[in-house]
């Protein structure tokens, strides 16, 4: 396994797609093109919330701005969700329907593998919900406010590495890619 830096790719790889798949493909293609056509893979990950219509989604890392601050991203997410929940409660008082006014959310990862010049895609999803406040010190990103369905009483930031890896979106996508490689490498 070789990292992009080992191939001389040290710059930030562009992420201009509007979907996780597009960004994952863009990153893998960039590595492929700048590493002499070497087999490679890249991923993109995002957090999708029902109440915010899928946001932050593809913009998860820079949701609160280009500086990519995890803390600012969480602050913005919690503020936006609270505002939408308030709007939904007012609408319900007037008898209006408020579809998707829940804290349901999911992490998604899409991996693009370029093998022998052919592109293959693998996806992993971790379903859950967003808590009302940060809890836990582990993990990174949105982990302190994400409660996975498999562990409904704690945030992902409170899980051990083994617990998180067993259920994580990225782990699921990597296992799908590994299974595909195992199956196709034997042919």
Tell me the role of every PLM-derived stretch.
Residues 1-187:
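Anionic-ligand binding patches
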């Amino acid at each position: 396994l070789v990292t992009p830096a080992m191939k001389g790719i040290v710059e930030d790889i562009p992420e201009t797609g509007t979907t996780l798949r597009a960004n994952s493909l863009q990153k893998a293609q960039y590595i492929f093109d700048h590493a002499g056509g070497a087999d490679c893979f890249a991923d993109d990950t995002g957090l999708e919330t029902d109440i915010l219509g899928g946001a932050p989604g593809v913009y998860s890392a820079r949701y609160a701005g280009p500086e990519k601050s995890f803390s600012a991203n969480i602050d913005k997410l919690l503020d936006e969700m609270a505002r939408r929940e308030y709007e939904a409660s007012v609408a319900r008082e007037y008898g209006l329907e408020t579809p998707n006014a829940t804290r349901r959310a999911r992490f998604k990862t899409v991996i693009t593998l370029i093998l022998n010049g052919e592109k293959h895609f693998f996806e992993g999803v971790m379903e859950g919900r967003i808590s009302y406040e940060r809890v836990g010190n582990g993990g990174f990103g949105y982990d302190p406010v994400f409660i996975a369905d498999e562990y409904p009483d704690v945030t992902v930031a409170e899980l051990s590495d083994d617990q998180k890896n067993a259920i994580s979106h990225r782990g699921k996508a990597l296992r799908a890619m590994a299974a595909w490689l195992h199956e196709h490498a034997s042919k």
